[in-house]
Amino acid sequence: MSVYNPNDADFAFTIGIEEEYQIVDPETRELRSYITQILEPGRTILREQIKPEMHQSIVEVGTRPCRTISEARAEIVRLRGAIAGLAARHNLRIVAAGTHPFSSWMQQEITPDERYRMVVGEMQEAALQLLIFGMHCHIGMPNNEVAIELMNVARYICPHLLALSTSSPFWMGRNTGFKSYRSVIFSTFPRTGIPPTFHSASEFERYVQLLINTGCIDNGKKIWWDLRPHPFFGTLEFRVCDIATKVEECLALAATMQALIVKFYTMFEENTTFRVYRRALINENKWRAQRWGLDGKLIDFGKRKEVEAKALVHEIVELVDDVVDMLGSRKEVEYLLTIVDQGTSADRQLRVFAETNDLKAVVDSLMNETIEGVPVMTFDTESSVQTAHS
């Protein structure tokens, strides 16, 4: 059982989290295209852990590979605190939400980089309006064959994770009626959504090579599925989620992804398995998740009936119950039940708007929740850390 123990040298199922934050002006509450001013001092402090994105109003961070969710907690808190502090030097704030409630993509500046120029050249307006913010979670894999086997099974759970993460109900000043409008916007890109199944790692590699040979992509990173084997990191990357507004929500999702992967792997080792369903069926659940979040019903394809999404979250917590203590993630996984009780970020945003009829109040709430429990770093003029405060 050493392969399942985070304290063992052979442990493979590490966690890596990437988050994409909004850079926001606290006076106007609009997005600000300010990544260049944040990036230079940010690289001094965070080195490769801070990156630009296509729009200059986005800043991306990534944790180091973590064996436990406790390590990931320390990383996420440190990274959010550092980025919040770097933004504060310019009287700016950060927000973790899948879309900005009212800022327009037409007012955003594109990062001057050849890679982004090529994306815009190919994707045109679909790229320009891709003003969305996600959370990606990498789970380490023992080898490529295991990655494909686990992807085939874990596809089924992607809509459930999306429902738990929803944080993008507004788009360009409108209530979209969706809990995750980010997912709708991203669907305009090719090679997105629920992945197909593959019989082996070699079949997947032949598929990628075919796309490269026919000029569709230059490498596997341009396969943007909700769940994919990362072409360079040796991980299975969950990409389905809106960015979680609160740190606790982020950690609950990441811990659940790790626990599910470990659970599925133990089932393989015990010669039991989880049924693999068609992409067309899983897509039905994904549409429901992005539309209604936890307030809707998802389809239990094994039982061939609709089930309240909230009830299915309880089933997920029960499914991984026998692995969470070994992984040290019981508290974080059980926080899913708090999300069920209190709602997602999308639910809270909609409540604030219902109470105030003011999208600026929604941004204020998001700014506060993004750094809830996070010590914000302060920096001197040379960008070295001075202090941190909550």
From Swiss-Prot:
GO terms for biological process: modified amino acid biosynthetic process. Keywords: ATP-binding, Ligase, Nucleotide-binding. Pfam families: GCS2. The keyword Nucleotide-binding applies. It is an enzyme of class 6 (ligase). It comes from the Bacteria. It catalyses: L-cysteine + L-glutamate + ATP = gamma-L-glutamyl-L-cysteine + ADP + phosphate + H(+). One of its GO terms (molecular function) is glutamate-cysteine ligase activity. Its EC number is 6.3.2.2. NCBIfam families: gshA_cyan_rel, PRK13515.1. ATP-dependent carboxylate-amine ligase which exhibits weak glutamate--cysteine ligase activity. Belongs to the glutamate--cysteine ligase type 2 family. YbdK subfamily. This is Putative glutamate--cysteine ligase 2. It comes from Chloroflexus aggregans (strain MD-66 / DSM 9485).
